[in-house]
Amino acid sequence: MSAVAEITVTPVLVADLFVEGGRMPVYAHLVDHPDARVLVDTGLTQLHPLVADLDPRPYPLDTQDLDLESIDIVVNTHLHFDHCGGNRLFPGTPIHVQRTELEDALNQDGHTIREWVDAPGLTYVPVDGEFELLPGVRLLPTPGHTRGSQVVVIDNGGRPSVIGGDVAVWFGELEEAATEGLRIVHALDPELVWLAHQHEPWRPRAPR
């Protein structure tokens, strides 16, 4: 795949949750590409009884300094509630998600908040496996967190960057690479990996 040097990634804080005695951030990631503007995951915009125990504090995208109409493409790394709750803000915008993930979200009890996935006017683009979204930007299946999880791989020349969603929640999981998805990410030899629940990207340790 050819590199496109002008691709940038900007994290956008969209919520925080109460997890293991503290507040955990939830990030979406904005990809500015010469050909399109891509939003990876959409956070959440409202509360729901199914996740009340996590005490969510949403920072909805439509209340932030972000022009929603400037978004050309949405990607869901997976369809858990904190990654798809803002999908409803993008009716008619193509939303790329792995087909297996969409099927599980719509058919399996307990996978997500189904009405947030199946909101009116949404246009899903089911993806089967690896997919080139734009020059220098591809979607790559990374089963583990869910069987239909995917990451976004960005080639700016040299080692790639990865927007990982929940391929890992903690940096230590990336070090261990215990799931198929994490092993796939490691095989990319990435320069950095943006995670949905960390303020800063993970960078592999320099060899000793």
Where are these regions (language model features)?
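Metallo-beta-lactamase
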Residues: 2-3, 45-46, 51, 59-82, 97-141, 176-191, ...
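Core dinuclear metal-dependent hydrolase active-site scaffold
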Residues: 11-16, 26-32, 38, 128-157
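Pre-active-site segment of Zn-dependent metallo-hydrolases
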Residues: 19-21, 36-73
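Short, conserved loop/helix-junction motifs that constitute active-site signature segments
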Residues: 88-91, 187-188
